[in-house]
Amino acid sequence: MPRSVKKGPFVDGHLLSKVEKARESNSKRPIKTWSRRSMVLPQMVGLTIAIHNGRQHVPVLINENMVGHKLGEFAATRTYRGHAAGKKTK
């Protein structure tokens, strides 16, 4: 279920301040964050944000198509190595 329009998008305060600082200084360094629940805002477009997936920070370059989605959608938390191959007999 989507968030109420009157509440607006949720972004952690510390992440928003880091984004504003990076915008002011034209920094190209990735912004590390553990906040997977924060929504991608138009101010973040063009920045690289390193999103924590439980083990490491995955760098993600934010583009216009990502606006409105949650950061956690772009850093997979589970590794799938495929099903074990069946033993074939001749």
Curated annotation (Swiss-Prot):
Record-level GO BP terms: ribosomal small subunit assembly; translation
Signal peptide: none
GO molecular function, a single term: structural constituent of ribosome
Record carries keyword Phosphoprotein: no
Stretches with biased composition (Basic and acidic residues): 15-27
GO cellular component, one term: small ribosomal subunit
Record bears the keyword Ribonucleoprotein: yes
Keywords: Ribonucleoprotein, Ribosomal protein, RNA-binding, rRNA-binding
Residue span of region Disordered: 1-30
Family of this protein: Belongs to the universal ribosomal protein uS19 family.
General function of this protein: Protein S19 forms a complex with S13 that binds strongly to the 16S ribosomal RNA.
PANTHER family membership: RIBOSOMAL PROTEIN S19P FAMILY MEMBER, SMALL RIBOSOMAL SUBUNIT PROTEIN US19M
Name the record gives this protein: Small ribosomal subunit protein uS19
Lineage of the species this protein comes from: Bacteria, Pseudomonadati, Pseudomonadota, Gammaproteobacteria, Chromatiales
Gene of this entry: rpsS
